[in-house]
Amino acid sequence: MAITAKPKAGVWAVLWDLLTTVDHKKIGLMYTATAFFAFALAGVFSLLIRTQLAVPNNQFLTGEQYNQILTLHGATMLFFFIIQAGLTGFGNFVVPLMLGARDVALPRVNAFSYWAFLGAIVLALMSYFFPGGAPSVGWTFYYPFSAQSGSGVDFYLAAILLLGFSSLLGNANFIATIYNL
């Protein structure tokens, strides 16, 4: 009997597998890859900020655009990179392996929390394209600055709420995994 090689999966098969996976290792890698995409995007925002500050009286960005880019840079670095890559992506990959478990306790909740995280990034970036533009409130959303109105602020706040929901689901899944397995 001859040993047959497993046929290579096509691009669509691999994409479908990533879209429908509930494997904690794949989801952890997807979290990390998406967080590093957010890191690269925040790096582009940082380059725009540095370009504006390169020479005195630079007109590369208006004051409002500068504040919007500064807000997007800070919030993207904090909410979409540091927390997600450092805790969620790494935790998804490592925690079940450290426990000797085959998977997390709630794999579908784990997958949903990733897709909610990705949706939060999309909402945050969409805020730039609505009337009023992206929020220019700083990443802290401190009240005197956050009193501005506009659809961009609403979309960005919806993104932060969706990200919080995603984090709650993911962390509840970690707690259930550690407690039950």
Predicted regions and their residues:
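...captures the hydrophobic TM-helix bundle architecture rather than a specific catalytic motif
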Residues: M1-L181
